[in-house]
Amino acid sequence: MVFPFNKENKNLIENSDLSQFIISNVLDVRISKKVTTKVSSKENRQINWKIEDIELLDWNEDFDTFILGNIRELSEKMNFNYFVSIAKKCLEHNKNLVVYDNENIIDFKQAFLEKGLYLYTPYLDLGEYDETNGEMWHISKPVVCIAGTSSKQGKFTLQLNLRRELRELGIKVSHISTEPNGELLGCDYVHPDGLGSDNLGEISKKILFLNSIINDFSRYNDLIMIGVQSNSIPYSFGNINSFPLVQSNLMLSAKPDVHILCVNCFDSETYIERTIKTLENQYESKVLCLVVFPLSMCIDKNTGEYHEKRLSVYEMSIIIEKFEKRFGIPVFENGENDSKLVNELISFFS
């Protein structure tokens, strides 16, 4: 069971071919207006689900695990604690529970253990960390980082697509994700830094711990892929919340050889240039290419509200040509020409 149908779970469903389990049902609240909508796997459109109302779920159905996505905003909107309600239902009906948020799980962990059930959430446990007096491992295998200029650019989907393409070529890829559903989609390790994550520990210990994890994976793989969320450099310096501190931790721990930079079609060229220069200078890396997300923000003339608009093929070609001329590196549309992007990677490391 998967609930609700939000960004993270949409990604999980569309890339279900990468999972080691079968999704039986997809659920949401009726007020979302998504109930009865059909959703499908991206790789096989014949595998699909009709979104069902969670209030009508029969907990006696034959499923063993409930996947609960980020529900903080939904709980506030509905004035209802979905985590507590679903955790109690799982205990009552002997179901395992996977939770993307790391909130209040301590109140239920013992109860799940006593019933032989698991309650899982991704988090960074520095208890596994061995002190190294500050020494960093040199990662001997190529490290590729998918970075961006903002949130909501399809960075995780791009990582999954690249990993799929590389593995089809026989390249062993170790994938470290910052998305809470990463392990469900075959990632080797999850370092959550998005909504609802709880990253504890001193910055130096965190960097050393992640560096050790990445070094371990490099021993058995041909290439390391990491992805960071949201922006890679500050939008401004007026508020600490705009500082990409968690992103920097992961990039410092991996020291990427190459960055693939996701950008928006409406990003200023100055901001993109600042990002490229920072990534290349701070991490001694190479920004190999840009990947443009094909959605633009438009203002509704009647309501004055912003809404997303997908750019036409012609509009995208103009933007791609402009960025290629301005920055002198290849530019791709997100979701298109992934094989060409992989060829760029292989050529760089050859």
What kind of region is each of these model predictions?
Residues 98-101, 119-123, 173-178, 224-228, ...:
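General beta-strand structural signal in soluble alpha/beta enzymes
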Residues 99-114, 120, 126, 207-210, ...:
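Conserved catalytic-core segment of NTP-binding enzymes
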Residues 1-118, 284, 292-312, 321-332, ...:
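Long, basic/Gly/Ser/Thr-rich N-terminal segments
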Residues 143, 161-203, 307:
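N-terminal phosphate/diphosphate-binding loop that engages ATP/GTP or pyrophosphate donors
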Residues 65-69, 145, 223-225, 260-262:
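Structural motif
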Residues 185-233:
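Conserved nucleotide-sensing/catalytic segment adjacent to the nucleotide-binding pocket
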